[in-house]
Amino acid sequence: MLLNNVLAKEGLFSGYSFREKIDHNPEGTVGVLQMKDIANNYLHFDYQNIDKVNDISFKEKFFLNKGDVLFVSKGVNNYAFSIDKLDFPIIASATFFIIRVNENKILSEYLAWYMNQTEAQNYFSEKKAGTYVPNLKKQDILDLPLIVPPLKTQNAIAQTAKLLNQEIIILDKIKENRKELIQTQLINIINND
């Protein structure tokens, strides 16, 4: 089965293309998700600190929905992640492809996990074009071969992957705190000599 076979009516499309630099407006009503907002090896983004703009009559399709999958198609790293919550209206910049799936066929969390696995990543590596900034064509993404188990299995895989990602974030924080603690102790040793 191909990705194209599990899409919702809206399918796959590029995020919003701004004609000029995005100027953050703290009073803005719409968040703009950009590459700089992605953290922890593409595991999530910080909703509260993304740039905001005034609603400039964005088309409805550009507003992210819970369950959308965002895919980075430009550059060396091509990762996907699923939107699991939205605290306010957010659009994605043109750096991302927005993928809307038919949840009766495939779960968005499973699709994001699958697109980040070695088999899919190898497929994307083979399809990349461009020398300065490699990128993927929309059709190559649509033609991604998928393994689509039953929804119950997809859910189990997605939940396990989510727990693994949470563990990775926690372990990274522990490492960071431990490093800071040891550095502080070492500085204290030389200051007390």
List each model region and its residues.
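Sequence-specific dsDNA recognition surfaces
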Residues: 4-21, 37-66
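Glycine- and charge-enriched low-complexity intrinsically disordered segments
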Residues: 107-129
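A structural connector/turn signal
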Residues: 58-59, 86, 131
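A short glycine-rich beta-alpha junction/loop motif
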Residues: 90-95, 130-155
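A short beta-sheet element
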Residues: 73-113
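Non-catalytic DNA-recognition/assembly elements of restriction-modification systems
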Residues: 1-22, 27-28, 143, 148-193
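Short hydrophobic-aromatic micro-motifs
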Residues: 31-34, 64, 69-72
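Short, surface-exposed loop/turn microsegments at beta-strand edges and helix-strand junctions
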Residues: 22-30, 49-50, 62-64, 82-94
